[in-house]
From Swiss-Prot:
Belongs to the Mediator complex subunit 20 family. This is Putative mediator of RNA polymerase II transcription subunit 20. InterPro entries: Mediator_Med20. It comes from Dictyostelium discoideum. The keyword Transcription applies. GO terms for molecular function: transcription coactivator activity.
Length: 195
């Protein structure tokens, strides 16, 4: 797995897909990314503050889901969804979904599509993965400058430069090498700002 940068912008989807295809990007698949906010059920009249977490589902990982809660991110089996429904201790409050198209372009994989919240499009999601960072010699976290140049130089213009490095220190249990857990952190932070 390479290093990923995930962001949204308020432009038009056809413009972005034309840029990707002009650069030589080949559309290889479509899918969805689903992020649901769950709140703990507390008794009526209780002074307890309900705990919350986000649950992420990726079509590309049909057997896995990712849970983001406070300072912890966990990869679990997809059965977690049915367990939540059966136990009835948490209630799904809202869901944000991205309907993505996946493009391959040399050492890059680009996923792009509308972000939908309550039937309203809230922006365009862009995920850019630099796959050459997955080699053991290169730390994925050292690829941020190249990723920034690729995004801002080829996919823009954007009103502000796109941030490609992220502070993962709030999640001390994350592995040292970039993983799907880091990607889930980026998605939850993005979807929080959209809702």
């Amino acid at each position: 797995m390479g290093y990923k940068c995930i962001f949204s912008f308020k432009g038009q989807l056809p413009e972005m897909t034309k840029r990707i295809e002009f650069l030589g990007g080949i559309k290889v698949s479509t899918g969805t990314i689903n992020c649901s906010l769950y709140l703990e059920r507390v008794p009526d009249g209780s002074n307890l503050i309900p705990r919350e977490f986000h649950l992420l589902l990726y079509d590309e990982k049909p057997k896995k889901c990712f849970t983001v809660c406070r300072d912890t991110i966990v990869e679990t089996d997809r059965e977690m969804v049915s367990i939540l429904e059966k136990t009835n201790s948490y209630k799904k409050r809202q869901t944000t979904e991205a309907l993505i198209s996946k493009y391959e372009l040399g050492d890059f994989i680009i996923r792009v599509g509308p972000i939908v919240f309550r039937t309203e499009i809230r922006g365009i999601l862009v995920e850019v993965e630099y796959t050459a960072c997955s080699t053991p010699v290169t730390s994925p976290f050292n690829c941020t400058k190249l990723l920034s140049e690729f995004i801002n130089g080829n996919l823009g213009p954007f009103p502000e430069p796109i941030q490609t490095s992220f502070d993962f220190s709030a999640y001390p249990t994350l592995p040292k090498s970039y993983s799907d857990l880091h990607t889930s952190y980026q998605y939850v932070n993005l979807f929080r700002t959209i809702n």
